[in-house]
Every structure is written in C-alpha cells, then in structure tokens.
Amino acid sequence: MIQLVLLVYIKEKLMKKNILTTLLAAVLYFLCVGIGVFLGHLVDQTGNMFYAPAFSALVGGSVYMLLLTKVPRFGAITTLGLFMAIFFLASKHGAGAFLPGLACGLAADAIARLGNYRDRIKNTLSFLVFAFSTSGPILLMWINPASYEAALLARGKSQEYIDRIMVAPELDKILLFVSSILLCALIGAVVGQFLSQKIADKL
C-alpha cells in the first residue's frame, strides 16, 4: 500500500515537472520565433514573414532538442505546436494560418516517438517537420491571398503595406522558402543536439 502511494506521488511529481518543462520550452521557443522575425527583417525589410520560419528554426533547434531530452514523452512537441497555433490564431494572421502549428507539432511528435525520442536521425527529421509550424502566414498568403489580405486589413494595415509584403507564389520563391527552412532547421537540430548533450552531461 505504501509503495503504491509512493509510486503515485512520484508519477504526479514527474508529470508536474514535465508540464512545467514543456511550458518553459514553449516560452523559450516563442523568444526564438521573435529573434527569427528580427533576423528575417534584417535580411528582408519589406515587413513580411518570409525568412522568419528559417531563422526561428536556426535559433530554436536547441530549445527543441533540449525538450526532447528532458521530456521524452508523446505530447510535449504536440503542445509546443499547439502554442504556435494559438499564437497565430490570437494574432489574427487569417483563417488557416494556425493549421501548420497543429499539423507539424503532431507529425513531429509522432516521428520522434518512432525513435523513443532518443534516435538522433528521427529527432532531426522531427525538427525538420516542426520547423514548418511557423510557416502559416506565408502558406496562407500563397494558398488564399484574398483571406490573407482581408486579415491584414482587419488588423488595420494599409493597402500600401499589403502590396509591399505580398510575395507571389512563384516556383523559385517556393523553393527558396522551403529550402531555407530545411537548411536552417538542419543546422539548428545539429547544434541543438550537441548543446543538449553537453547540458545533459553536466546535470
């Protein structure tokens, strides 16, 4: 009886710790997205989010890999993706801009789970998928430009601003967008795995 109570207590403590770690990771990843937006603005000053997902993945890989190390359970990455989705939904980027956060978070979690969250290759593939969780605004711009423009107008943006940030869905632009995210996510994942291992070794 005492052993059962003790086991339940330990599980509850571990669950609370996992929840707090996941929430902290979500906050840190939001900061990484903010840095990604800033770096993207330095590269392209038109004001759109074209390079933000790539730079967010570059600086956010360490947070992602550390979360996999600390909470190797299904649900942590899905929760991270859910927070991304809520952010885009709350910031009124347009109907559908939140969907990549949900889809990529769930898919990335499933991929990492295939390797029990310890397989470096599967964890890397997982992050390559998750990196597209912040691509909602650009994808919506290409898939449904009318809805995207309407969302911007509803947020008080001028037509001049909208005309300036719109990116035509041309093949070279699409390839640049996808390849930049994949490349930066790969670098972010490798650096993140190295740093998370270093941190884990010291703990």
Regions found by a protein language model. Name each.
Residues 49, 126-198:
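Membrane-embedded alpha-helical hairpins and interfacial helices in multi-pass inner-membrane proteins
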Residues 7-41, 150-176, 197, 201-202:
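Membrane topogenic helices and adjacent juxtamembrane segments
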Residues 26-37, 57, 61-65, 89, ...:
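Transmembrane alpha-helical segments of multi-pass membrane transport proteins and ion-pumping complexes
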Residues 4:
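Cationic, low-complexity basic patches in intrinsically disordered or flexible, solvent-exposed regions
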Residues 76-85, 122-133:
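Central hydrophobic cores of alpha-helical transmembrane segments
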Residues 15-79:
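Hydrophobic transmembrane alpha-helices
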Residues 37-42, 49, 84-112:
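Interfacial aromatic-anchored transmembrane helix boundaries in multi-pass membrane proteins
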Residues 101-131:
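Cytoplasmic juxtamembrane interface segments
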